[in-house]
Amino acid sequence: MQRHMLKSKIHRAAVTHCELHYEGSCAIDEDLLEAAGLIENERIDIWNINNGERFSTYAIKGERGSGMISLNGSAARRAQLGDLVIIAAFAMVDEAELQAGWKPKLVFIDEGNKIKGHRDHVPTQNWT
C-alpha cells in the first residue's frame, strides 16, 4: 500500500512578488527549493495564512539567495505582497519506505525569507 504523505514544507514565507501577467507558477528562491527537496515544475500547494486561500500551482526557480516568493499568473490574485504562506508538496510513499524511517523536509524561515531551521516532523499539538 502507498500513502499520500507530506514531503516538503516551507513554513511562513512572505510573498515578495505578485506577477499577474507572468506565465503561471510560483518562483521560489533556489536555496529554499533545495532545502525543502523541491524541484522545478513540481506541483505545490500554497496556503495563505493571512486570508485562508488555498491553491495549487507548480514551482520554478527564483534567484538564489534572494528570498523570492513570487506568485505568478492567476495565483497572483490569491495573495498580497507581504502575506505569509505555507508552501507544501506531497508524495506517494510505500509502507517499506515509511518503516525504514522516511521523513518529510520541513523548512522554517525568518522575516527575510532566509532559512532559520529544519525539522523532519510536526510536533504533537498539546492543549495547554
Swiss-Prot record:
Record carries keyword Membrane: no
SUPFAM superfamilies according to UniProt: ADC-like
GO molecular function per UniProt: aspartate 1-decarboxylase activity
EC numbers: 4.1.1.11
Cofactor note: Binds 1 pyruvoyl group covalently per subunit.
Subcellular location: Cytoplasm
Positions annotated to bind substrate: 57, 73-75
Known cofactor(s): pyruvate
Residues annotated as catalytic: 25, 58
Family note: Belongs to the PanD family.
NCBIfam families with a match to the protein in the record: panD (TIGR00223)
Subunit (UniProt): Heterooctamer of four alpha and four beta subunits.
Functional summary from the UniProt entry: Catalyzes the pyruvoyl-dependent decarboxylation of aspartate to produce beta-alanine.
UniProt-recorded name of the protein: Aspartate 1-decarboxylase
